[in-house]
Amino acid sequence: MLRVRCLRGGSRGAEAVHYIGSRLGGSLTGWVQRTFQSTQAATASSRNSCAAEDKATHPLPKDCPVSSYNEWDPLEEVIVGRAENACVPPFTVEVKANTYEKYWPFYQKNGGLYFPKDHLKKAVAEVEEMCNILSMEGVTVRRPDPIDWSLKYKTPDFESTGLYSAMPRDILMVVGNEIIEAPMAWRSRFFEYRAYRSIIKDYFHRGAKWTTAPKPTMADELYDQNYPIHSVEDRHKLAAQGKFVTTEFEPCFDAADFIRAGRDIFAQRSQVTNYLGIEWMRRHLAPDYRVHIISFKDPNPMHIDATFNIIGPGLVLSNPDRPCHQIDLFKKAGWTIVTPPTPVIPDDHPLWMSSKWLSMNVLMLDEKRVMVDANEVPIQKMFEKLGISTIKVNIRNANSLGGGFHCWTCDVRRRGTLQSYFD
C-alpha cells in the first residue's frame, strides 16, 4: 500500500519522524510515529461498528449540494472567487516569507491599499468570462459576497487590513459531503471566511456538513519574527531543515496545501500550514480518509497545487523545478507522473504572490476536459497528447493575484463516489 511506502520512505521517513517529533515535543511524537506506520490499525478501526454513525462513507442526504472526493470526477457545481476590492496585504513577516524579494517594495508602498485599479478591472473581466464558460459547460457557478477588504480590524493580538476573496481553494476544502473552513495563517486573511458564509449556510440548510477548523489567535508566537530569508539559498536550506515562518504555537493551515485522491489526501508542511494543522485534519478525517505528508525541493512552499496537481486516477502533474521527495513511491504504486512544460508567461508580467508555474494550476471538469490558460500553448499540447480536451481561458491578469484556475475555484459537487486509488 502506498501509505506504508510513502510515509515510511527510507531514510527520509526516519528523518521526518525524528525532526517532527523533536520540533513538537514528546506529547506529539506518538502521532507522528503512528502516521509513519502501516494502515492496518486504521483499516481495523474503520470496520468498528462504533464508527458506523455519521461517516462520509454513508449515503449522502438526498440532493445534498456538497459532494466531492477528488480533483477529476465530473464537475457539477463550483465556487469561483472575486477580485473586486482586493487589497495589498500589510508587509508582515508571514507575507515577506511567502513573496519574492523583487516585489517587497510594492508591498512596503501599497500595504493596506487596493491593488492597482486598472489591473483589478482586467482581472475581474477575465474571471467573469471564466464563470460564463463554466456555465456554458454545464457547471453551476456560485460567487462569494462582495466585501471591502480595506477595512482595518483589530483583535487582542494584532491589527490588519484584509486581502480578498479571490481564492476559495485557499480557505475551503470539500471532503465528501462536508465543507471545511481552513483557519488560514496570514493575518490579512483572518476574516476572509465572511465572504463565503452565505453560500455555506445555504449548503448547510440543504443537508451538507459544515466544519470550521480551530481559529488561530495569530499572536506573535505563531511566527518566527527573525525568519532569515535573504536569499533563495537560505530558503532552500531552511525548507530542507523543516524550518518555516510559521511555528507550532497553534494549528494553522490553508486548504490549498491539501490535495485529494479519494480516501487518500496529500498535504505539505509549508509557510502557511504547520504540522499541528495537518494533524488536526488527519484526526478530523480519520478513519475514512488517510492524510499523508509529502515534501518537495521548494524554497518557498505555499500551496501544493502548482507543485503537485493530481488530475486523474493514477495521473499527477509534478513540477520539475520542485521535485517531490517521495515521487518514486507514486511510481511504484503504478501512477503516471507527467512533467509539465516550462511556462511561457513573460518575465515582466507582475506575479505579486506566485510563480510562473500557475500554468499547471488547472481545473479538471472531468477526466477528459481541463480548463487551461489560453496563452500557455505548450501545456495545452501536453494535455492533448494525454487525450484531454482543453478549454482555453485567458486569466493572465487574474494570475497576478496569486492563483490559476484551481486556486480561483473550489469544486463543491462532482459526480462520483468515494474510492481508494492506492490499495
Curated annotation (Swiss-Prot):
The modification N6-acetyllysine is found at residue 385. Keywords: Acetylation, Membrane, Mitochondrion, Mitochondrion inner membrane, Phosphoprotein, Transferase, Transit peptide. GO terms for cellular component: mitochondrial inner membrane; mitochondrial intermembrane space; mitochondrion. Arginine binds at residues 170, 305, 322, 354-355. Its main location: mitochondrion. Disruption phenotype: Knockout mice do not manifest aminoaciduria or glucosuria. GO terms for molecular function: amidinotransferase activity; glycine amidinotransferase activity. One of its GO terms (biological process) is muscle atrophy. The keyword Hydrolase does not apply. It catalyses: L-arginine + glycine = guanidinoacetate + L-ornithine; 4-aminobutanoate + L-arginine = 4-guanidinobutanoate + L-ornithine; beta-alanine + L-arginine = 3-guanidinopropanoate + L-ornithine; taurine + L-arginine = taurocyamine + L-ornithine. It is found in: Mitochondrion inner membrane. The modification Phosphoserine is found at residues 46, 49. Transamidinase that catalyzes the transfer of the amidino group of L-arginine onto the amino moiety of acceptor metabolites such as glycine, beta-alanine, gamma-aminobutyric acid (GABA) and taurine yielding the corresponding guanidine derivatives. Catalyzes the rate-limiting step of creatine biosynthesis, namely the transfer of the amidino group from L-arginine to glycine to generate guanidinoacetate, which is then methylated by GAMT to form creatine. Provides creatine as a source for ATP generation in tissues with high energy demands, in particular skeletal muscle, heart and brain. Belongs to the amidinotransferase family. This is Glycine amidinotransferase, mitochondrial. It comes from Mus musculus.
